[in-house]
């Protein structure tokens, strides 16, 4: 985007106003256009032209985003079209199966239908809607012929089906299910419309925020270019800059050309920093809004994907609500009901023929009585099964509640374990802080007693070592070395006494040399020193000790300060973690209170429902008792009649038992075969639909993963740009602090300039790697200069490349640098 913005600005007018002129125009009085000033009008028109081009560029970005969205939408519609084509083929298959089933039940020779016309695939998804309606109208006569044939078959039979009450009950049940499905459909349609409205509103908000973000990016890029131009002009205004320590314009010894904030430059830089701070606050607020909107967009996108998958691969309930399925289902149910009624009539007719053949007029009554007995038995079994189901449901509910309770306990245990781990980590950090404090206090104590050896021991071994044992070990080592040297001298010299005396003489000579060197360093080479010189030497020696003590205290204070900084940083992190923990606990407490309130409300509702159910149950029990008494009276009468007819029933049952069993077995096998075939076809269709839904879900997943990767890369780029801008702003703030400090101390412009020049020269003399030691050695290959410690560290670590230019060097390429 920055490259595009730069191209837009380069295409503006050649004589466009400078950034400083634009700032003056923007920060002047309320009337930026002066009618009497033609030059001001021209500059204003140029600024207006630049703003217009930037607005055109932002609108082009918006058009590009809209084009990408429409392309994606077109791809989704194409995928939906393919799914609908598959649905059309499924409907064709369903129609073929219905025609085959009807033909098998009624007989193809009696129907007098042309199978080619009936099974011709007229539903082509590529044809327009009028042609589809024409195809349906062409099939309408065939359907009417089938219905007419079934009506004729019903008309030939004078008796009505015996299961008319069952059919009516089933019809009422299906109507109730249809009304429930219609209400659910309307509810889902209202939810979809609400989601569409919220999605449109979120898209409008996202479009508005994207425009604002583009505008802010362009303003930020413009401000950055203006600042760079001002910095370039400031660098050109100070040409008297010295070269670096190596004599080359390389990163080694680099000194930045600081702007002179004195003599009227301070207020402008203060204004720039103020504008920068305001822009930072605005960017932070916009970033929060963008994160919130991105989260909402992600949720809406997930919801859209879910709805899209449901639209492309609807569920069985949605398919059952479709008009084509309802038409075919109605036709199929009508055909099946008629076939069942015909089968029942056929059975009744056969029984009547048997009765007429056997001259048994009471056969029907016996059959009805037996059917009633079986019905009562089945009712008792159904009641028993209902009680068993209720008992199993109660056990299931108890087990589910127990499982939920155990899961809640496990979640609480996990939370408690996590809190214990966090507490242990904080205690560990506290121990490290206390260890640092002990080290700092020991260093302070050593500095107070001027113990340089103890300070070095603390730096090397820390607080766990024993200083006395370390000194004893050093004494033992020194004594061993002395003994070894003494024994060596004894072996070299034949006379032990002479060797011992020579050793003592050499020891005294070395001590005298050290003492003489110290006196010569203080008094000079002249051995004849006056009393004032001796006094001066004593004072110098005393001051030298004080200086060494002060340096030791200063070093210890710096180490203590660094340790305090690290402790403060760690404590701040612990405080932030504790604050987050407190906030999470407050939120958990609020959620718990809300949950308790909701459970109390639900309990009250459940109690009301329970009492209402108990009252209804009592009323039903009373009605059941009254019905039971009437049934018992009727049963007594039936038992008396059954005792008379028992002998006749036994004979009839013995004769017809075998034939009835065979017929029932044949019918059961036919029904099972038809059921298995229908289930197989239905499972195949479900498998195909599930596979299509899986493929589309995988495509959506890959698309979302690609979008997430692209967004991550763009975010990383923007983060790098923001880090660079933060470094520049930090440098500007440091310079402003330096100017403010100089103005508070009452330093004049000339003195401040001299101080800045002194700091620059001191920076030139110091090593560019560590910025602490002075430059002592030079690399002869590239002539870059560094301190001795930095080069020795690189040689020891085998990183033998110049820190400034990266040129490889050897140990022989390093020479000592002499300042003259």
Curated annotation (Swiss-Prot):
GO terms for cellular component: HULC complex; nucleus. It is found in: Nucleus. Residues 1-12, 213-233 have a biased composition (Basic and acidic residues). CDD domains: RING-HC_Bre1-like. Its EC number is 2.3.2.27. The keyword Membrane does not apply. It holds the Pfam family zf-C3HC4. One of its GO terms (molecular function) is zinc ion binding. GO terms for biological process: chromatin organization; protein ubiquitination. A zinc finger (RING-type) spans 767-806. InterPro entries: E3_ubiquit_lig_Bre1 (IPR013956), Znf_C3HC4_RING-type (IPR018957), Znf_RING (IPR001841), Znf_RING/FYVE/PHD (IPR013083), Znf_RING_CS (IPR017907). It catalyses: S-ubiquitinyl-[E2 ubiquitin-conjugating enzyme]-L-cysteine + [acceptor protein]-L-lysine = [E2 ubiquitin-conjugating enzyme]-L-cysteine + N(6)-ubiquitinyl-[acceptor protein]-L-lysine. Pathway: Protein modification; protein ubiquitination. PANTHER family: E3 UBIQUITIN-PROTEIN LIGASE BRE1, RING FINGER PROTEIN-RELATED. This is E3 ubiquitin-protein ligase BRE1. It comes from Cryptococcus neoformans var. neoformans serotype D (strain JEC21 / ATCC MYA-565) (Filobasidiella neoformans).
């Amino acid at each position: 985007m920055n490259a595009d913005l730069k191209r837009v600005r380069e295409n503006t007018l050649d004589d466009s106003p400078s950034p400083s002129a634009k700032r003056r125009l923007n920060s002047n009085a309320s009337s930026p256009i002066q009618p009497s000033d033609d030059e001001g009008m021209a500059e204003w028109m140029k600024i207006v032209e630049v703003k217009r081009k930037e607005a055109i560029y932002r609108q082009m970005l918006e058009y590009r985003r809209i084009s990408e969205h429409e392309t994606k939408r077109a791809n989704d519609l194409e995928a939906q079209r393919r799914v609908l084509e598959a649905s059309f083929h499924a409907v064709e298959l369903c129609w073929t199966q219905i025609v085959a089933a009807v033909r098998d039940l009624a007989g193809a020779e009696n129907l007098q239908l042309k199978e080619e016309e009936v099974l011709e695939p007229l539903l082509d998804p590529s044809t327009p809607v009028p042609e589809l309606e024409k195809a349906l109208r062409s099939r309408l006569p065939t359907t009417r012929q089938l219905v007419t044939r079934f009506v004729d078959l019903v008309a030939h039979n004078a008796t009505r089906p015996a299961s008319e009450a069952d059919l009516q009950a089933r019809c009422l049940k299906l109507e109730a299910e249809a009304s429930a499905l219609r209400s659910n459909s309307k509810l889902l349609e209202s939810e979809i419309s609400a989601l569409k409205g919220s999605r449109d509103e979120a898209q409008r908000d996202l479009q508005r925020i994207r425009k604002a973000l583009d505008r802010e990016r362009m303003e930020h890029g413009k401000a950055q270019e203006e600042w760079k131009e001002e910095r370039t002009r400031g660098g050109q205004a100070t040409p008297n800059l010295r070269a670096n320590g190596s004599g080359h314009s390389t990163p080694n010894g680099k000194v930045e050309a600081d702007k002179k904030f004195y003599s009227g430059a301070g207020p402008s830089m203060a204004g720039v920093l103020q504008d920068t701070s305001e822009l930072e606050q605005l960017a932070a607020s916009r970033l929060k809004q963008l994160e919130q909107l991105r989260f909402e967009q992600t949720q809406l996108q997930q919801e859209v994907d879910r709805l899209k998958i449901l639209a492309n691969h609807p569920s069985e309930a949605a398919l059952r609500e479709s008009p084509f399925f309802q038409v075919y289902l109605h036709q199929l149910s009508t055909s099946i009901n008629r076939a069942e009624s015909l089968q029942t009539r056929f059975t009744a007719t056969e029984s009547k023929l048997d009765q007429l053949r056997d001259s048994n007029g009471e056969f029907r009554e016996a059959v009805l009585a037996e059917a009633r007995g079986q019905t009562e038995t089945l009712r008792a079994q159904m009641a028993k099964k209902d009680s068993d189901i209720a008992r199993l449901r109660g056990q299931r509910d108890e087990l589910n509640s127990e499982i939920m309770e155990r899961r809640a306990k496990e979640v609480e245990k996990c939370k408690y374990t996590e809190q214990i781990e966090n507490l242990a980590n904080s205690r560990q950090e506290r121990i490290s802080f206390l260890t640092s404090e002990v080290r700092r206090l020991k260093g302070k104590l050593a500095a107070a007693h001027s113990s340089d050896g103890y300070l070095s021991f603390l730096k090397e071994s820390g607080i766990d070592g024993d200083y006395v044992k370390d000194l004893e070990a050093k004494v033992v080592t020194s004594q061993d070395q002395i003994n070894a040297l003494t024994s060596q001298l004894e072996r070299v010299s034949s006379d032990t006494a002479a060797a011992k005396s020579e050793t003592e003489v050499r020891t005294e000579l070395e001590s005298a040399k050290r003492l003489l060197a110290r006196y010569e360093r203080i008094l000079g080479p002249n051995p004849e020193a006056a009393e004032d010189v001796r006094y001066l030497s004593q004072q110098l020696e005393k001051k030298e000790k004080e200086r060494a003590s002060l340096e030791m205290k200063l070093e210890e204070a710096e180490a203590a300060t660094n340790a305090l900084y690290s402790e403060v940083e760690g404590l701040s992190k612990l405080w932030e973690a504790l604050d987050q923990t407190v906030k999470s606990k407050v939120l958990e407490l609020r959620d718990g209170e809300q949950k308790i309130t909701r459970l109390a409300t639900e309990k009250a509702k459940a109690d009301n429902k329970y009492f209402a159910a108990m009252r209804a149950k009592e009323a039903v029990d009373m009605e059941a008792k009254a019905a039971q008494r009437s049934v018992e009276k009727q049963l007594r009468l039936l038992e008396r009649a059954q005792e008379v007819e028992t002998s006749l029933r036994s004979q009839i049952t013995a004769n017809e038992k075998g034939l009835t069993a065979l017929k029932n077995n044949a019918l059961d096998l036919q029904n099972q075969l038809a059921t298995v075939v229908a289930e197989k076809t239905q499972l195949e269709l479900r498998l195909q639909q599930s596979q299509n839904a899986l493929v589309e879900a995988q495509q959506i997943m890959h698309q979302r993963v690609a979008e997430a990767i692209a967004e991550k890369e763009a975010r990383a780029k923007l983060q790098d740009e923001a880090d660079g801008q933060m470094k520049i702003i930090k440098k500007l703030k440091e310079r402003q602090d330096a100017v403010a400090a100089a103005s508070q101390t009452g330093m004049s412009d000339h003195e401040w300039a001299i101080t800045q020049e002194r700091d620059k020269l001191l920076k030139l003399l110091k090593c560019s790697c560590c910025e602490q030691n002075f430059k002592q050695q030079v690399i002869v290959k590239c002539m870059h200069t560094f301190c001795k410690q930095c080069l020795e560290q690189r040689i020891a670590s085998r990183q033998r490349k110049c820190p400034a230019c990266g040129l490889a060097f050897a140990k022989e390429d390093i020479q000592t640098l002499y300042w003259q």
